[in-house]
Amino acid sequence: MLMAKLSDQPFVTEISVITEEVTPIAPSIRNMEKACLAIITTSGVVAQGNPDKFKAVSNTKWGKYSIHGLKDMKEGKWDVVHSGYDTVYMNADPNYGVPLDMVRQFEASQELEKGCRFARLYPYFYSSTGVGGVTSAMQHVGKEMAQNMKSEGIDGAILVST
């Protein structure tokens, strides 16, 4: 194959190229001031004790954890399950991965421009990790999360990546 390529001859690769499914862009939210938003994170923040048994690498699960009544993530009890970054800082302040402190400030602000306000924050956040994940498994996780959000009447999401 190398010799053919160097000689400008046709060649066939020994490794098949994977064609990814194209995901269409979602339409804009028509009326943000009536919208319910959810927080989604890939930081691996989970409820204390890791009740959904996330794996630090090649995780195939997602979880949904209550933030009802919390002003920020430091008020809750959380663990971080992720091997793609140093979790020391996230364990010290989970707001880095689930920016509840900032979203609550945004939610309460009366000074936002029209069209930037939203009606409410969904009282749970969604979490998973993608480090070392197989694409098909991550697509499955994403589809399950999206179906759950749709069934809960969530209009949009704030996706926090690590």
Task: Tell me the role of every PLM-derived stretch.
Residues 1-162:
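An N-terminal assembly and electron-transfer interface module characteristic of large anaerobic redox
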